[in-house]
Amino acid sequence: MTFFDSCARMSARRTCAALPFLAFRGTTMKRFSILLILLFLTGCAAAPVETSEPTLPTPTTEVPVPAETTVPVTTTPPDPIQELLDSMTIEERVGQLFLARCNAESALTDIQEYHLGGFVLFGADFEGQTPDSLRQTLSGYQAAAGIPMLLAVDEEGGTVTRISRYPAFRSQCFPSPREAFAGGGLTQALSNEEEICQLLQSLGINVNLGPVCDISEDPNAFMYQRSLGQDAAATGDFVAGTVRLMNAYQIGSVLKHFPGYGNNADTHTGLAVDSRSLQALESSDLLPFSAGIEAGCGAVLVSHNIVQALDRDSPASLSPAVHQYLRDTMGFDGVVMTDDLVMEAITDRYGTGEAAVLAVQAGNDLLCSTDYAEQYSAVLSAVLDGRIDFDALNASVMRVLKWKQSLGLL
């Protein structure tokens, strides 16, 4: 037997010997496999099941955003007076500075040529008229004016009566404030002023050059008969009461003659110098003006007196210092006007045209003028060549227009 035969026999024996084991092994392996499968399935069933976090549904519509709120913009309505001023020519603006003495023969032409701010009516303008004819005349003046006019008069009563001296308008002259007060105190004096307001209103006159604020104790003084004849306190009560009455009737009030005439001479015929101290003026003469300003007066008329406490050289009407005192110290923001610029206290020293220029430069808004043709040309030239500040001109015209507005003219 060869080596290879021997090996073959040994291999056969091993195989035969292993068969029972393999048979057992095969059965066992099947069972083991089945057991593993069952264990695996059981383990899978017992294992916890992972659950994912719930997801919110994606919104399909946009979340509404609150509408943006807008704050309403408040706009200041345009000022009709400013619009009127802006529309005016330089010539028209200069003309508004003039309260001219009415010349009946050329009145309609002059209103349009010089663009006059107003007329002052004197006795001759009422002579031969009736209330109806006068109303018609004054309506004609207003119709001719591009801008409604101030129609003013001196109806103080007593020695200064432009209207009531004529029976067509009143059976007898109005008494002076002094006479009315002496007859019935403040009540009677104010009743007299109210009747004056009613008469002026009925005729179409919108300004009375009063009340007189002056205090005069000297029976020989120029202003004595025209003053109330009382102390500063009583005069102040009369002035304030008169201003309130005039405002109620829409009659323009004009406090005169700032800063107080006192016992001084008549400036119609020459220069008057007041040498009193400022303390003396402030403790007496200026008090009625303060009362009138507080009551709401429309205008203040400045005298031609040289008041040395405020300006040692210039008449008050032409003095920047006097006007500054009236504005800054007295607190007056209305119309400031001159007494008539043809009075000799002015013309003898300055001439007609130059006086008007100086009056505007001093701070007057309104010039009482008889020679308005010459003075209008002088003021216009001074504006054009820069001697009169254009902004100052506009400020004066604005004050005049605002006064007209307060009187129901604009």
Where are these regions (language model features)?
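Short, well-ordered coil/turn segments that N-cap beta-strands
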Residues: 95-96, 117, 146-149, 205-206, ...
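Enzymes and membrane/adaptor proteins characterized by extended Gly/Ser/Thr/Asp/Glu-rich
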Residues: 112-235, 257, 262-275, 303-318, ...
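Alpha-helix-loop-beta-strand connector modules within alpha/beta enzyme cores
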Residues: 141-147, 230-251, 316-337
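N-terminal hydrophobic targeting/anchoring segments and the immediately downstream early-domain regions
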Residues: 45-48, 53-151, 155-165
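Mid-to-C-terminal alpha-helical segments outside catalytic/metal-binding sites
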Residues: 385-410
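Short, Lys/Arg-enriched N-terminal segments with co-localized hydrophobic residues
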Residues: 17-28
